[in-house]
């Protein structure tokens, strides 16, 4: 075999082995992003809500700093309840991974009847959070808080 071909083949194999250790992307968070965009046109959920307050994004500590942060806390609690459901306990059915179906028309979101028990539960968590987000003011001063001092 040509040494150049062998080098390319080796690089491809190493790349594939490396890619196999990359965890799957959270599919549900992408759906949740679309849900929010559907009901809050012009929003940028990943940018706007990631690292907001004490509960939006990866934070889960302390007291919510405002109404929007309380929405995220409630959403986190709903996901925790979903994980306690037997049908949602596996990795593929976890709240961050489980895909579900929904429709959005004129800003109204409906979780579809074809969802299984776990999908329906998670869809309703996301739907309730989306409704909460739509009614909560966004305070720029609560974006990228110093969690160590503000979220005790």
Curated annotation (Swiss-Prot):
GO-annotated molecular function: calcium ion binding; calcium-dependent phospholipase A2 activity; phospholipid binding; signaling receptor binding; toxin activity
Subcellular localization: Secreted
Paired cysteines (S-S): 38-104, 54-151, 56-72, 71-132, 78-125, 88-118, 111-123
PROSITE patterns, A to Z: PA2_ASP, PA2_HIS
EC number: 3.1.1.4
Signal peptide (from-to): 1-21
Cofactor(s) of this protein: Ca(2+)
Gene3D superfamilies tied to this protein: Phospholipase A2 domain (1.20.90.10)
Keywords: Calcium, Disulfide bond, Hydrolase, Lipid degradation, Lipid metabolism, Metal-binding, Secreted, Signal, Toxin
SMART domains xref list: PA2c
Chain positions recorded as Ca(2+) binding sites: 55, 57, 59, 76
Family, as annotated: Belongs to the phospholipase A2 family. Group I subfamily. D49 sub-subfamily.
Function: PLA2 catalyzes the calcium-dependent hydrolysis of the 2-acyl groups in 3-sn-phosphoglycerides.
Full protein name: Acidic phospholipase A2
């Amino acid at each position: 075999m040509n040494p150049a071909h062998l080098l390319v083949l080796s690089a491809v194999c190493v790349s594939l082995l490396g890619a196999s250790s990359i965890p799957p992307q959270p599919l549900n968070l992408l759906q949740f992003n679309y849900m929010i965009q559907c009901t809050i046109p012009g929003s940028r959920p990943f940018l706007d809500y990631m690292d907001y307050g004490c509960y939006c994004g990866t934070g889960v500590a302390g007291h919510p700093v405002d109404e929007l942060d309380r929405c995220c806390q409630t959403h986190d609690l709903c996901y925790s309840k979903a994980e306690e459901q037997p049908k949602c306990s596996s990795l593929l059915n976890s709240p961050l991974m489980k895909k579900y179906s929904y429709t959005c028309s004129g800003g109204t979101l409906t979780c579809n009847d074809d969802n299984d028990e776990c999908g329906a539960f998670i869809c309703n968590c996301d739907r309730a959070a989306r409704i909460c987000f739509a009614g909560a003011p966004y305070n720029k001063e609560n974006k990228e808080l110093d969690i160590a001092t503000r979220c005790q």
